[in-house]
């Protein structure tokens, strides 16, 4: 397949190029496009054949649900049931409206019960649908030029770090999709927060830039789902819950504890790697770069700046891949605010390999 790369001007999105991208979606093709979180791999959410193509292009398990992206709040009614009798949560429509008013367009995905308009191929066989309205201007125009309902997981090979730059998308999906829209680097760098409204209370299934504290200000009874814990047997209802995600090619380990002991431990391991002719890398904040003796040290931003870490994390993991790093050690990061999402992704990327020193 010949993949077209479309470079767009954010200040002039009304031309024929975006209309062409939309036509690809309407005709059953696939287009990778930027959002404020990560790049997405888009197809017609209401066309089961398009959803199957997404799974095939990514090498993604077909029971891993896709998020349906919309550009207008009224679009929910076609794809989600809002009848209060179908939910345990009281005033479901009011809850959705409060969340939408507070966080849409933006990095929040809401799970509701699906209508028959949404094929099971899009929902991973579930009776629920995950819905998001992205804030990125290119994404909004693209969705409107398409069918209005764009199913899109991250635009990468399944299991790899999510793409935050168009070069990441080209590396993974060139030759696998019809078009890649080049919108530059993304703003946030981590996938959206996911909130499930189909149970007895709102549950956070995936942390993101919309934090637990921010959600509590709007829906006070929200809580974190037990499926976020490593040993949970809960069935996955959202992307990122079941399979290994975000992983570099090298073996990643997180090291926690007193920072001096952490640095000493990692430096000791780096020496072992050197003796064994294994290329070793380290992830750390800017302030610690000179304290490490590994051949490759990547910084994610200043101490306490978890937003910078979020924006850099996936790029750093891909840089290690490009440099052939075989073993990676990472410091842990503050879990407050978006730091919770950073640690969620880092732990998954490490396959839950954590060393306490």
PLM regions and their residue ranges:
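Active-site-adjacent structural elements in enzyme catalytic cores
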Residues: 1-357
């Amino acid at each position: 397949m010949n993949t077209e790369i479309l470079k767009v001007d954010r200040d002039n999105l009304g031309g024929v190029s975006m209309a062409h991208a939309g036509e690809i979606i309407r005709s059953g093709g696939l287009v990778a496009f930027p959002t404020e979180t990560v790049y997405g791999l888009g197809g017609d959410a209401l066309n089961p054949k398009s959803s199957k193509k997404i799974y095939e292009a990514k090498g993604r398990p077909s029971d891993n649900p896709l998020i349906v992206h919309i550009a207008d709040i009224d679009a929910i009614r076609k794809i989600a049931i809002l009848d209060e009798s179908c939910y345990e949560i009281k005033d479901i429509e009011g809850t959705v409206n409060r969340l939408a008013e507070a966080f849409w367009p933006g990095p929040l995905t809401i799970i509701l019960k699906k209508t028959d308009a949404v094929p099971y191929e899009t929902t991973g066989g579930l009776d629920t649908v995950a819905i998001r309205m992205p804030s990125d201007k290119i994404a909004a125009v693209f969705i409107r030029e398409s069918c209005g309902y764009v199913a899109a997981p991250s635009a990468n090979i399944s299991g790899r770090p999510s793409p935050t730059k168009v070069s990441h998308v080209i590396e993974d999906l060139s030759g696998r999709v019809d078009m890649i829209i080049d919108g530059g680097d993304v703003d946030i760098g981590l996938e959206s927060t996911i909130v499930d409204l189909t149970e007895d209370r709102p549950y956070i299934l995936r942390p993101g830039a919309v934090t637990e504290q921010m959600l509590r200000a709007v829906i006070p009874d929200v809580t974190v789902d037990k499926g976020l814990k490593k040993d949970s047997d809960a069935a996955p209802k959202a992307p990122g819950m079941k399979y290994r995600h975000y992983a570099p090619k090298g073996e990643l380990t997180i090291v926690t504890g007193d920072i001096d002991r952490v640095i000493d431990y990692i430096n000791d391991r780096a020496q072992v790697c050197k003796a064994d002719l294994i290329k070793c890398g380290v992830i750390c904040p800017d302030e610690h770069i000179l304290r490490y003796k590994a051949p490759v040290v990547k910084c994610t931003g200043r101490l306490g700046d978890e937003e910078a870490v979020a924006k850099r994390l996936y790029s750093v993991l891909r840089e290690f891949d490009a440099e052939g790093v075989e073993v990676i050690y990472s410091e842990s990061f503050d879990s407050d605010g978006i730091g919770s999402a950073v640690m969620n992704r880092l732990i998954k990327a490490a396959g839950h390999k954590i060393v306490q020193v």
